[in-house]
């Protein structure tokens, strides 16, 4: 093909001047050259679509990527398990401390949160008692706490408590004629109580005017303080323990002015580098081993990334050769399905997995070195990459007809399933918005859109049906009747019709694949080209030795363009 192939590097005895060749000879050699290029392209295509075992038998090419993927699965999974155990300790330590803080600083906390808040109070006396209780508990923290806690510095580099109250700017209430004048602008007043102030006797700080609350104007009271802690359970795992700074905020929420003040405790834990720590044993050596292991994982993923990227590039080159040849010979373009055969989705998946593993491993090393503290991003990267690695193994099982039914069924049913889900999703969203608007005030499972979507999805799978029916409040007969019509229609529509059709689409694709496996798949243009004979009847009289020589010479010159993909 012009511009795409190099000229033949023939031996000196074969380089005859064009003037000695007649028109018949030049036409024959041109046809022979086209025949050689077609045979070379067909061989490269056949080799590209071979399995690693077939490639090894054909050209003795060792399947490096297959061996590397198997090794990578073992290494990445081991890395993920170790990181998951470490992350589990971190999350458990944070949650345990949050529960401990609620018991320490919230008066009357029962151990179980009320909805999304911890506890609630209903009288002015209980409000003052709860505020002063939290302050006094902070003062006597080291004498009452079981944990290794200490006082930390807040964001303004001060040790102690910061109490802020938000209230409407001005207001006046006259109970005689039931009038209330309120300026909707909210102002915030704050006071800082140092440890020296809290330890004074008598407690003069409690008698200040700041703690005289006008409850009809009060919007919110916040008590903020910082505490330090050490996670010593990491020592049992032969790791360097983490030091934490807990930024705690106790919020008394009176926004609704309904006679009920909700109390929240929010604790944000930040990991910091421990200072002046001396731990004997093999902890430091164990950390070094983990860092070396992470470096080895990065090297394996980098090698896999290079090999897969090279394979993708070579596949695109082969695709370009085939498209140009097909257009030149048959005067038509290759269909899109055949073009996508050259884009190996498994290589793309492995490439993405390698990139995520490399980035996640680097973050993990920084976390082990106490330079970073964000476990969540690292866990998402490592977890997703491990998922992709294990999914990529299916590619090698797909070479066996017994195991590739799942892959072929997913490929065949995915377009139809996506189109079906797009239509069913419109109905699902309609039910979601309707349930949120109508049933939200009367049912805890319909309070917001996220919970409604989760509740409806559970109903589609047949989970928790009776509880959803039973928990509706019968304060309004009209809403109660509507809830029955709403739930019965949704369950009937999605379980008996939508879900059944969804399964039928996948089942139909499965039966189609089984039928094709028994009677053969429909042949595409690419498959027909691979089955064609490379030589035509008009050129069978040409010496086969010359054809073989030309093919070998051409392959020797165009060796860089061969597709050697295992």
Swiss-Prot record:
Q: Which residues lie on this side of the membrane: Extracellular?
A: 87-288, 368-376, 441-448, 470-480
Q: Would the keyword Ion transport turn up in this protein's UniProt record?
A: yes
Q: What S-S linkages are listed for this chain? A: 164-190, 243-274
Please give one Gene Ontology molecular function term for this protein: iron ion transmembrane transporter activity
- InterPro entries the record matches: MCLN_ECD (IPR049134), Mucolipin (IPR039031), PKD1_2_channel (IPR013122)
Top-rank lineage group of the source organism: Eukaryota
Gene3D superfamilies named in the record = 1.10.287.70
Question: What's the impact of mutating residue 424 to P?
Answer: Constitutive active channel that mediates strong inwardly rectifying current
| Gene Ontology CC, one term | lysosomal membrane
Gene induction: Up-regulated in microglia cells and macrophages by bacterial lipopolysaccharide (LPS). Up-regulated by infection with M.smegmatis.
> What protein is this chain from?
Mucolipin-2
């Amino acid at each position: 093909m012009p511009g795409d192939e190099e000229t033949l590097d023939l031996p000196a005895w074969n380089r005859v001047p064009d003037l000695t060749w007649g028109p018949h000879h030049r036409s024959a050699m041109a046809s022979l050259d086209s025949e050689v290029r077609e045979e070379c392209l067909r061989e490269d295509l056949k080799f590209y679509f071979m399995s690693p075992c077939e490639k090894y038998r054909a050209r003795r090419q060792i399947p490096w990527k297959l061996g590397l993927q198997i090794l990578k699965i073992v290494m990445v999974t081991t890395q993920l398990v170790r990181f998951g155990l470490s992350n589990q300790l971190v999350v458990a330590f944070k949650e345990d401390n949050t529960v401990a803080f609620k018991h320490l600083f919230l008066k009357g906390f029962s151990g179980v949160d009320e909805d999304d808040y911890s506890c609630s109070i209903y009288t002015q006396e209980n409000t003052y008692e709860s505020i002063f209780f939290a302050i006094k508990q902070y003062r006597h923290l080291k004498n009452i706490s079981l944990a290794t806690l200490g006082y930390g510095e807040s964001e303004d580099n001060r040790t102690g408590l910061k109490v802020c109250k938000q209230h409407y700017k001005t207001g006046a209430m006259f109970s005689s004629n039931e009038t209330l004048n309120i300026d909707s602008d909210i102002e915030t007043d704050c006071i800082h109580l140092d440890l020296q102030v809290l330890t004074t006797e008598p407690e003069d700080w409690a008698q200040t005017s700041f703690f005289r609350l006008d409850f009809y104007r009060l919007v919110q009271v916040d008590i903020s303080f910082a505490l330090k802690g050490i996670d010593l359970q990491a020592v049992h795992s032969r790791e360097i323990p983490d030091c934490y700074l807990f930024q705690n905020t106790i919020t008394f929420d009176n926004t609704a002015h309904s006679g009920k003040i909700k109390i929240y405790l929010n604790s944000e834990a930040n990991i910091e580098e421990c200072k002046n720590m001396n731990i004997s044993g093999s902890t430091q050596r164990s950390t070094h081993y983990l860092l070396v292991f992470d470096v080895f994982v990065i090297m394996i993923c980098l090698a896999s990334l290079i090999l897969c990227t090279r394979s993708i590039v070579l596949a695109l080159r082969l695709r370009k050769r085939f498209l140009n040849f097909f257009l030149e010979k048959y005067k038509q373009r290759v269909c899109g399905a055949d073009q996508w055969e050259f884009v190996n989705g498994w290589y793309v998946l492995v490439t993405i997995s390698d990139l995520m593993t490399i980035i996640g491993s680097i973050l993990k090393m920084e976390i082990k070195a106490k330079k970073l503290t964000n476990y969540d991003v690292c866990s998402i990267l490592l977890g997703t990459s491990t998922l992709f690695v294990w999914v990529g193994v299916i590619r090698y099982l797909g070479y066996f007809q017994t195991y590739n039914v799942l892959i072929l069924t997913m490929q065949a049913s995915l377009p139809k399933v996506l189109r079906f889900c797009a239509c069913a999703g419109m109905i699902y969203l309609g039910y979601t918005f309707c349930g949120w608007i109508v049933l939200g005030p009367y049912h805890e499972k319909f309070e917001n859109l996220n919970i409604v979507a989760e509740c409806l999805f559970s109903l589609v799978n047949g989970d928790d049906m009776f509880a959803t029916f039973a928990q509706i409040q019968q304060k309004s007969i009209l809403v109660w009747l509507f809830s029955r019509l709403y739930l019965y229609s949704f369950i009937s529509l999605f379980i008996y019709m939508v879900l059944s059709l969804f399964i039928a689409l996948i089942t139909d694709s499965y039966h189609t694949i089984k039928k094709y496996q028994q009677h053969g798949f429909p042949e595409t243009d690419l498959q027909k080209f691979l089955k064609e004979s490379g030589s035509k009847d008009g050129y069978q009289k040409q010496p086969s030795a010359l054809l073989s020589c030309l093919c070998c010479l051409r392959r020797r010159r165009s060796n860089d363009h061969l597709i050697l993909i295992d």
